UniProtKB/Swiss-Prot annotation:
GO molecular function terms listed in the Swiss-Prot or TrEMBL record: glutamate N-acetyltransferase activity; L-glutamate N-acetyltransferase activity
Main location: mitochondrion
Taxonomic lineage: Eukaryota, Fungi, Dikarya, Ascomycota, Saccharomycotina
Residues holding substrate: T177, K204, T215, E301, N436, T441
Transferase is among the record's keywords: yes
CDD domains: OAT (cd02152)
Official protein name in the record: Arginine biosynthesis bifunctional protein ArgJ, mitochondrial
Catalytic residues as annotated in Swiss-Prot or TrEMBL: T215 (nucleophile)
Organism of provenance: Vanderwaltozyma polyspora (strain ATCC 22028 / DSM 70294 / BCRC 21397 / CBS 2163 / NBRC 10782 / NRRL Y-8283 / UCD 57-17)
Superkingdom as given in the UniProt entry: Eukaryota
Amino acid sequence: MKLNTKLLQQASKSVDKYALYVPKNGVFPRGFQVGSTASGVKKNGNLDLGIIRNTNTSRPAAAAAVFTTNKFKAAPVVVSKQILEDKNGTGINAIVINSGCANSVTGEVGIEDAKKLISHVDSKLGTSMSTLPMSTGVIGQRLHVNKISKGIDEIFDNNKFGSDFQSWLDMAKSICTTDTFPKLVTSRFSLPNGEKYTLTGIAKGAGMICPNMATLLGFIVTDLPIKSSALKSILTHATNRSFNCISVDGDMSTNDTICMIANGAVETKEIDETSQEYVQVQNQVTEFAQQLAQLVVRDGEGSTKFVTVKVQNSLTFEDAKIIAESISNSLLVKTALYGQDANWGRILCAIGYAKLDNLKSLNVDKINVSFIATDGSEPKELKLVVNGVPQLEIDEARASEILNLNDLEISVDLGTGTEEAQFWTCDISHEYVTINGDYRT
């Protein structure tokens, strides 16, 4: 059998993702501490348990979360959702996260196991119903409650909490499974009142990424004072434009959760939906969530490319997003990207079967499709389809150059409206099959 030289070269391209995407320092919000340990759930002895806690007691913290829409919701998802509803998104002081076991499809015993862990943390904090449980790992296995409980004791009794960079980096490491690098993002922003506020986020995920909220976990904390209803609205808006706009393999997990806590440690006027600063905060959180979500795609299992799919001039944002998602989830598009094949027919096919809310968003005689180079090289744009007509004389050499980039963009102009949406995806390689074929062994 003759081997494909181009694919061999592609597979051999080595990128040190840890060096590229893991920060060396950061800024962190007031009033939060994190602690992590190796409880023994992971067979390799790596960190597998982390706790985020709020130490600001001057006001009740606001909390919000967006959960998986998978019908088989994991026990920690069910429990966390109920707690947030019962407490109207206020007074959440901790999140306990274990990796290595998803506590999913475990029935009532899984619910009880999750409740045991949060009760343990609450007892350490001297509170009641103020902790949310989160889990990630293998589906269908019961939680190792004894090991994790001992890990909780170790974190609290040995005061393994900290608010420095290393503590946060270890926290990010503790929630990893098949991730090749921990995902940590920090940012500081100002509002017109002159005060500065801080956002810190961690995430895990490399496979099973096709959220409507996969296995994907994300946590954002801030010292901004904000009403819980406003926080929920902002997080939903941000998630719909970030974590719900990423795809690695098209699988949706049972455990997906994006959670945000705002403790108001910077004591300024509380923000609500009517505040002048509301839209600015929404934009800040959305941009921040996009940075964090993109790291998940950059760590896509076995991936060699990070691809932005931008759909412009649609009748609605929703239809632009549906088309971007359809392209991003197409295995034929993903494999063509890996093979550096400028197969625009696969892109058009994915656009054509997208289940649009408004069929008028797509007019096949107006559509334009291009590859966009992101490295500054010229020509930046390689047109594949113009006003619905395929460009039969494509510069194959230029196409190969663009498709050889680690970062590139697929641009789609529908020409039917003014709305736009973006999705972030990656290619699918031989290594993806190897990683997931060997996952439980």
